UniProtKB/Swiss-Prot annotation:
Amino-acid positions noted as binding Zn(2+) in the UniProt annotation, renumbered to this chain: C16, C18, C37, C40
UniProt keyword annotation of rRNA-binding present: yes
GO BP of this protein: translation
Metal-binding listed as a keyword: yes
Gene that this polypeptide is encoded by: rpmE
Source organism, top-level taxon: Bacteria
Function text: Binds the 23S rRNA.
A Pfam entry, by short name: Ribosomal_L31
Self-association and partners: Part of the 50S ribosomal subunit.
HAMAP family in the record: Ribosomal_bL31_1 (MF_00501)
Cofactor details (free text): Binds 1 zinc ion per subunit.
Keywords for the protein's UniProt record, in alphabetical order: Metal-binding, Ribonucleoprotein, Ribosomal protein, RNA-binding, rRNA-binding, Zinc
Source species: Yersinia enterocolitica serotype O:8 / biotype 1B (strain NCTC 13174 / 8081)
UniProt name for this protein: Large ribosomal subunit protein bL31
Length: 72
């Protein structure tokens, strides 16, 4: 392999807004500030909300549905 073509890996500290600090090897070269991490992200903590916003299909079905019929 050629010498000197590979990036230099440094020890970087990634700090989350929740206070979690993660030390990783990265080519970025400076410390990182994260908005969310695995400790505070709603998907991983189980505090996930179901956002049921009607889209174009729901609007179409509401506009062109036949009154008096029910969905099976």
């Amino acid at each position: 392999m050629k010498q000197g073509i590979h990036p230099k890996y440094d020890l970087v500290t990634a700090s989350c807004s929740c206070g979690n600090v993660i030390k990783i090897n990265s080519t970025v070269g400076h410390d990182l500030n994260l908005d969310v991490c695995g400790e505070c992200h709603p998907f991983y903590t189980g505090k996930q909300r179901d956002v049921a916003t009607g889209g174009r299909v729901d609007r179409f079905n509401k506009r062109f549905s036949v009154p008096g019929t029910t969905k099976a």
